[in-house]
């Protein structure tokens, strides 16, 4: 199991590339083919499933190492990756709703349609980072949680766990985990490029010309966009400090997941309105306007609570109740320790007894 764990981690990070389109239709040795190994109707679901398999490589590494640091690191990593996979999956649901497919190639093609504002063709590609900004932001945040990179590298933080779940590894298995980490970073960047940045399609305003937006040019655009996301990974590592573990988990469960659920409901409702043609019904628009005004009024007036009502009175606190000292909580008051003297008091008493010597 100890030797199998890094192999599982390495295979999981490479498998996702089989369904990521690197380019469109190209001519190769007299044959026309796509720059993609395979495309299945549930390609994005396959990517999420493979990412979940990578967690087993981390858990098995910590369990088989028989070390405290390794076990704690693997538990942290598994909890972190599972928590942020939920928010990541919810952020991708809106992409499925807009594109109408889970196929990676069809999602890229759906982003090639131009944005039309008031009947005017802007010639700007409808990339989902622009149409689905909340989903894009949530995916970028969860991307760091999935890759265990700063500011979310809590399973490997040197100040607490030495090297985390890879503390007991050396040589080739140790290098395999580092390879898996950086390949996973490239995989997440490629998925971000495919689902939100238009994939192999040329960016605006280069998409005006069909010459540089087809054939082998797609490989260049895909590579440049992926490198841009990888650069963002490196920049964040150098610019943002590490999160505390409880803050990190609160961000995932109390912020990202509720926001993702609310955003999915909003997008689904909006698409239903467009498909049913309710947007041209004045009665429907009036009802929606009244509901929005009521929500805004409730948020600014009725949603406020009295902060003083939740404050509990100060309570006495025994720091040694569990057998070892623990710090008091904000609403607890630590009782004075009987017979305890500080080092300064003892030194002053000895100084007085010796006559100032």
Regions found by a protein language model. Give the residues of each.
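Selective transmembrane helix interface/packing segments
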Residues: 1-357
């Amino acid at each position: 199991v100890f030797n199998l764990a890094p192999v599982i981690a390495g295979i999981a990070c490479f498998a996702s590339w089989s369904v990521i389109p690197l380019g469109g239709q190209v001519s190769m040795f007299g044959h026309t083919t796509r720059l993609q190994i395979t495309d299945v109707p549930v390609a994005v679901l396959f990517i999420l499933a493979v990412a979940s398999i990578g967690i087993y490589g981390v858990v098995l590494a910590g369990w088989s190492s028989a070390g405290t640091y390794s076990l704690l690191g693997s538990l942290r990593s598994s909890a972190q990756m599972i928590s942020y996979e939920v928010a990541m999956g919810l952020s991708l649901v809106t992409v499925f709703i807009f594109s109408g497919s889970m196929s990676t190639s069809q999602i890229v093609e759906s982003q090639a349609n131009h944005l039309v504002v008031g009947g005017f063709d802007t010639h700007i590609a409808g990339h989902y980072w622009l149409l689905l900004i909340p989903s894009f932001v949530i995916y970028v945040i969860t991307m760091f949680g999935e890759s265990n990179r700063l500011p979310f590298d809590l399973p490997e933080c040197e100040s607490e766990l030495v090297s985390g779940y890879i503390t007991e590894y050396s040589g080739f298995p140790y290098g395999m985990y580092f390879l898996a980490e950086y390949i996973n970073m490239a995989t997440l960047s490629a998925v971000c490029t495919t689902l939100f940045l238009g994939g192999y399609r040329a960016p605006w305003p280069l998409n005006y010309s069909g010459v540089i937006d087809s054939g082998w040019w797609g490989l260049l655009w895909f590579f440049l966009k992926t490198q841009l996301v990888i650069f963002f990974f490196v920049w964040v590592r150098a610019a943002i400090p590490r999160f505390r573990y409880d803050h990190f988990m609160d961000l995932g469960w109390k912020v990202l997941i509720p926001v993702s659920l609310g955003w999915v409901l909003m997008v689904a409702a909006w698409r239903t309105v467009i498909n049913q043609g309710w947007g041209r019904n004045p009665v429907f628009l009036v009802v929606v306007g009244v509901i929005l005004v009521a929500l805004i009024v409730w948020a600014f007036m009725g949603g406020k609570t009295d902060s003083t009502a939740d404050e509990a009175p100060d309570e006495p606190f025994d720091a040694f109740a569990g057998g070892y000292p623990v710090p008091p909580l904000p609403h607890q008051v630590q009782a004075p320790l009987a017979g305890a003297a500080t080092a300064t008091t003892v030194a002053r008493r000895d100084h007085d007894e010796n006559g100032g010597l």
